Amino acid sequence: MTNIGSLLVDAAALMVTGMGVVFIFLTILIFLVRLMSKLVPQEVPPPITAPKAVKNQANHTSTVSPQVVAAISAAIHQHRASVAK
């Protein structure tokens, strides 16, 4: 069997090597992202145009028909009666 000390040394060396590779990769990635942000121009949003005027809808009435009011009132009364039981 091999010595446990040599296994720990090998494990530590592998860990440090892996952490070093990740550190170098992330450093290069940050450098490239900063370089790209300087080279590529920012997007300019399209100019805001004035909204189109909405035509006045005179055809529609703003009142509710009495049948609709009666139906809604009956439904509310029925619901309240069923909840109260």
UniProtKB/Swiss-Prot annotation:
For whether the record's keyword set contains Kinase, the answer is no
Cofactor dependence: Na(+)
Membrane among keywords: yes
Q: Which residues cross the membrane?
A: 11-33
Task: Classify the source by domain of life.
Answer: Bacteria
Which InterPro entries does the entry link to? Na_pump_deCOase, OadG
- Catalytic activity field: oxaloacetate + 2 Na(+)(in) + H(+) = pyruvate + 2 Na(+)(out) + CO2
UniProt GO cellular component terms: plasma membrane
Q: How does it assemble?
A: Heterotrimer of an alpha, a beta and a gamma subunit.
- Known function: Catalyzes the decarboxylation of oxaloacetate coupled to Na(+) translocation.
What family is reported?
A: Belongs to the OadG family.
**Name the UniProt record assigns to this protein:** Probable oxaloacetate decarboxylase gamma chain
Task: Identify the coding gene.
Answer: oadG
